[in-house]
């Protein structure tokens, strides 16, 4: 396996998982996602929600909700790009499955309210990218702006995407501007 990894450097590695064929829980899939990303440095994992096909042994099995497929794709992205671990997802699992009504990053933030709001002027990059609404480019832009001056108001975030979502999870100079915009 080590030889396979060494020989594949610089090449794109992708795998695919069918979701809902068996009785697997998201918890099992997330463990596999973390393991595969850690050990095989995958470019991504593709998920496909099961859909029954007539005249096959599984034709009477109900189709899987496509939203489950999407939530698992989001988990893969959070693991691969943002450094989330299996432990990060444990508090948001319900009976071993992800909530479908909210994205995993927001669910994680809501399950970890003790970490929020964060002070945007002092939070490190790794914490900024865990804020719902803040991605890598936005985190880099925030860090760039705060090198120029302290961020004190919503006006200082002008031009940054998802500001309405971000405000719930941040403070600027100790002030929270959520519901004040």
Task: Identify the residue ranges that each predicted region occupies.
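Conserved AdoMet/S-adenosylmethionine-binding subsite of the radical SAM
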Residues: 1-84
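Conserved aromatic
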Residues: 23, 150-151
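Structural recognition of alpha->loop->beta junctions
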Residues: 35-42, 161-170
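Long, highly charged, low-complexity intrinsically disordered interaction regions
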Residues: 55-130, 165-181
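Residue-level signature of tetratricopeptide-repeat
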Residues: 145-146
């Amino acid at each position: 396996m080590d030889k396979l990894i060494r020989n594949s450097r610089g090449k794109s590695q992708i795998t695919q998982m069918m979701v809902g064929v068996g009785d697997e829980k998201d918890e099992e899939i997330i463990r596999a996602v973390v393991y595969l990303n850690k050990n095989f440095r995958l470019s991504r994992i593709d998920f496909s929600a099961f859909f029954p096909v007539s005249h096959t042994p599984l034709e009477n099995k109900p189709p899987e909700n496509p939203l489950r497929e999407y939530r698992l794709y989001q988990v893969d992205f959070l693991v691969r790009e943002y450094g989330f671990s299996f432990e990060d997802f444990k508090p948001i699992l319900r009976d071993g499955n992800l909530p479908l009504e909210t994205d995993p990053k927001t669910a994680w933030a809501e399950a970890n309210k003790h970490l929020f709001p964060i002070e945007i002027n002092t939070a490190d990059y790794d914490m900024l990218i865990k804020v719902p609404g803040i991605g890598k480019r936005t985190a880099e832009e925030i860090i760039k702006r705060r090198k120029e001056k302290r961020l004190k108001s919503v006006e200082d975030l002008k031009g940054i995407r998802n500001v309405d979502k971000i405000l719930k999870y941040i403070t600027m100079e100790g002030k929270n501007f959520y519901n004040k915009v």
